[in-house]
Amino acid sequence: MQERHTEQDYRALLIADTPIIDVRAPIEFEQGAMPAAINLPLMNNDERAAVGTCYKQQGSDAALALGHKLVAGEIRQQRMDAWRAACLQNPQGILCCARGGQRSHIVQSWLHAAGIDYPLVEGGYKALRQTAIQATIELAQKPIVLIGGCTGSGKTLLVQQQPNGVDLEGLARHRGSAFGRTLQPQLSQASFENLLAAEMLKTDARQNLRLWVLEDESRMIGSNHLPECLRERMTQAAIAVVEDPFEIRLERLNEEYFLRMHHDFTHAYGDEQGWQEYCEYLHHGLSAIKRRLGLQRYNELAARLDAALTTQLTTGSTDGHLAWLVPLLEEYYDPMYRYQLEKKAEKVVFRGEWAEVAEWVKAR
């Protein structure tokens, strides 16, 4: 059983999306995990807490004995069955605990006794986490081109289509605005950073990467924030601004926020509940900027949103949403973005419609 413990080994694990059987407790996994990890804990949260208390009060030997007592009999067999199945399903995988200590070694020895030799991560999650942090710091030093533009300019799609593009919003599972949530819950901050590091490592490994193409994001993307090392580099980066006609932007927003979100909600929840979730999603987005709109203007737009939803429900048409979307863009989102762009005008190196910016980026 060969353990992997060099920096290059850790990076190779992330680049290859090597399946990781993470045997830490669920609470630890939720706080931060690697992208390709599945959580099959040696101890659940309560068992881990009990063993931790025992360790503090009575020492390591007593804690180890308690752990073996808690994970015994049918409980141990159930967990063994899960580990065995995961090992057989992921023969190229690897075991991981917090620091490559007792938990992963215990599971490894139990599997060995059952006839399965499976490697473990020496240094555990902590070593992988440090590798992810260091990789982001290093890779962020490469030149960056940011794709800017008003809401609905197709910036995310443009980034996605570049071989050296990294979709920060996709990784964060959020589109960055008040209406930015998706049906996928956002990851913990550590898990988001790990996912970002893995994506940057994989993208860099696929080619002789000269520069990154990223969307011009603020520090926060929903509840996740960009690593400071990357954010600092982005503040110094050149910006290419997409300037598409207003009507084209409206078409994109209609497709993304009304047609697609309605489809996604009904697909996930069924027609009736999906419709309610979709309505709540739009109202929540508008409510999030109530103070900035002012109460009177918010109430006017909320009433128009209600009318648009009624029309959509009865006719299937999303055209009614223009009655609140157009003023929201003209009075709030567009002025806000233009103000932000003015503050970094010296960083703008190219302006053009979507296809022109895409061609310019391709030539870099």
Swiss-Prot record:
Belongs to the SelU family. It holds the Pfam family Rhodanese. GO terms for biological process: tRNA wobble uridine modification. Monomer. Its EC number is 2.9.1.3. Residues 14-137 form the Rhodanese domain. The active site is at residue 97. InterPro entries: Rhodanese-like_dom, Rhodanese-like_dom_sf, SelU. One of its GO terms (molecular function) is tRNA 2-selenouridine synthase activity. It is an enzyme of class 2 (transferase). HAMAP family: tRNA_sel_U_synth. It catalyses: 5-methylaminomethyl-2-thiouridine(34) in tRNA + selenophosphate + (2E)-geranyl diphosphate + H2O + H(+) = 5-methylaminomethyl-2-selenouridine(34) in tRNA + (2E)-thiogeraniol + phosphate + diphosphate; 5-methylaminomethyl-2-thiouridine(34) in tRNA + (2E)-geranyl diphosphate = 5-methylaminomethyl-S-(2E)-geranyl-thiouridine(34) in tRNA + diphosphate; 5-methylaminomethyl-S-(2E)-geranyl-thiouridine(34) in tRNA + selenophosphate + H(+) = 5-methylaminomethyl-2-(Se-phospho)selenouridine(34) in tRNA + (2E)-thiogeraniol; 5-methylaminomethyl-2-(Se-phospho)selenouridine(34) in tRNA + H2O = 5-methylaminomethyl-2-selenouridine(34) in tRNA + phosphate. This is tRNA 2-selenouridine synthase. Involved in the post-transcriptional modification of the uridine at the wobble position (U34) of tRNA(Lys), tRNA(Glu) and tRNA(Gln). Catalyzes the conversion of 2-thiouridine (S2U-RNA) to 2-selenouridine (Se2U-RNA). Acts in a two-step process involving geranylation of 2-thiouridine (S2U) to S-geranyl-2-thiouridine (geS2U) and subsequent selenation of the latter derivative to 2-selenouridine (Se2U) in the tRNA chain. It comes from the Bacteria. Keywords: Selenium, Transferase. SUPFAM superfamilies: Rhodanese/Cell cycle control phosphatase. CDD domains: RHOD_YbbB (cd01520).
